[in-house]
Design a protein with these regions (language model features):
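Acidic catalytic/metal-coordinating carboxylates
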Residues: 42-45, 66-72
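The feature encodes the CheY-like receiver
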Residues: 20, 60, 65-66
């Protein structure tokens, strides 16, 4: 997997602001395990570039004048058997566009004012196959947008332990951290997380958490217990 055992993580930058792209490229180029494979100024360019360059991670502005980050993310997730991880970039944490991008299949989001170290860590995190979750921000997004899926978890048949694991995931914990909290093995947690995703029909942890909040399984007005 990219980012493990010294493997280089391939990245595609997508933003209509050339200065933003230049800043991101400078930050990422300073890291030996990160390689910016290409850039795009509009979401319409993304599918072709992804097929040609095969990036592991796409850093994409959520708001662009022609094809935005939401449409581009949705296209990648629905048209490719193994789409890259998508991190959407936004100026404001409560941007409704970000909420739509998460629903479309984005792995997480970053504020454009994030510190260089945070950007680098975010790319590495999602390249490992983990979702980039900021629990408070996700809660605020869902509470602010006021949208409810309602049926997302009904009939999913989650066991008590799977529900417990989902709540820990919603708090932003990694598999290793959940294993420590539950005093179980890492492989056991991975199995539970896999079962949760399969039962919810979720592509990744981010979509599972959004479904949990939307369905009322976790109240977006209060932190997950």
């Amino acid at each position: 997997m990219a980012g493990d055992d010294g493997a280089v993580i391939g990245i595609l930058l997508v933003d209509d602001d050339e200065l933003v792209r230049a800043g991101l490229r400078a930050i990422l180029a300073a890291e030996p395990d990160l390689d910016v494979l290409g850039e795009a100024s509009d979401g319409a360019e993304v599918p072709g570039l992804v097929r040609r360059l095969q990036p592991d991670v796409v850093l994409m502005d959520v708001r662009m004048p022609a094809v935005d980050g939401i449409a581009a993310t949705r296209h990648l997730v629905t048209s490719l058997p193994e789409p890259p991880r998508v991190l959407v970039l936004t100026t404001f944490g409560n941007d409704g566009y970000v909420y739509d991008a998460l629903q479309a299949g984005a792995t997480g989001f970053l504020l454009k004012r994030a510190r260089p170290a945070e950007i680098v860590q975010a790319v590495r995190t999602v390249a490992r196959g983990e979702s980039l979750l900021f629990p408070a921000a996700v809660r605020d997004l869902i509470a602010t947008q006021g949208r409810a899926g309602g049926d997302a978890l009904r009939g999913a048949g989650l066991t008590d332990r799977e529900g417990e694991v989902l709540r820990w995931v919603a708090r932003g914990l990694s598999n290793a951290e959940i294993a420590r909290e539950l005093v179980v093995g890492l492989e056991t947690v991975k199995t539970h997380v896999g079962n949760v995703l399969a039962k919810l029909g979720a592509r990744d942890r981010t979509q599972a958490v959004v479904a949990a909040y939307e369905s009322g399984f976790i109240d977006p007005r209060r932190p997950p217990e």
